[in-house]
Regions:
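Start-of-domain marker
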Residues: 35-102, 113-115
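Sec/Tat signal peptide C-region and signal peptidase I cleavage site
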Residues: 30-34
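Bacterial N-terminal signal peptides that target proteins for export
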Residues: 8-20
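N-terminal amphipathic/basic-hydrophobic helices that include classical n-h-c signal peptides
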Residues: 1-9
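Short, mixed-charge aromatic SLiMs
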Residues: 1, 87-89, 183-184
């Protein structure tokens, strides 16, 4: 009866192989779609009085999701390879009637230092003209062919700039193709 025992072991092995293959294909398809940015967005609206704060909370959530969930290039980034960046936006003026935001933004991006546990900042810039229209619950969509929204244009510009510069830190001219897209 040792013959029957071998057959059961073989079937279990085949099932395990099948399960392992299935799990690997899930992992690969998941990592293949990992976006490039790991952005943190903060909205400082202390200078704006008498406005419902929910519009600023919604802006923060919308920007965070847009920057992190949009696939900016066709490059494959693992989740742990995503570029850590910060968009610290200070609202200096907000017109409720026109949904116009006048802001300045401090944008920073970091990368890991090779063979160490710390990171270094490779991009740090203040944009004093980070101005756009945004109505609460607006959905942001980016089409590189037709840029019809100032907020998506600003996000795309900085996303391409950060990704391109990050690629340049790994190899000379490594980000040239992506940086070229900033000019569009």
């Amino acid at each position: 009866s040792s013959h029957g025992k071998g057959k059961g072991t073989m079937i279990r092995r085949q099932r395990l192989k099948w399960l392992a293959t299935l799990l690997m294909s899930f992992a690969i398809s998941f990592s293949a779609n990992a976006q490039e940015l790991n952005a943190t967005v903060t909205i400082n609206h202390n200078q704006i009085q008498g406005t419902d704060a929910s519009v600023f909370d919604n802006l923060k959530e919308t920007l965070t999701n847009f920057l992190n969930d949009h696939q900016w290039t066709n490059l494959k980034f693992q989740k742990n390879e995503r570029i850590v960046c910060n968009f610290n936006i200070t609202v200096t003026k907000y017109d409720v009637a026109t949904n116009m935001f006048t802001c300045k933004a401090l944008i920073q991006a970091n990368r890991p230092v090779f063979n160490s546990s710390y990171t270094t900042t490779f991009y740090n810039n203040t944009d004093n003209d980070f101005n756009f229209e945004f109505a609460q619950f607006d959905q942001l969509a980016f089409n590189e062919e037709v840029i019809d929204n100032q907020l998506t244009a600003l996000c795309a510009y900085y996303a391409f700039l950060i990704i391109g510069m990050d690629l340049d830190t790994f190899s000379p001219m490594g980000g040239e193709d992506v940086l070229q897209r900033c000019m569009n």
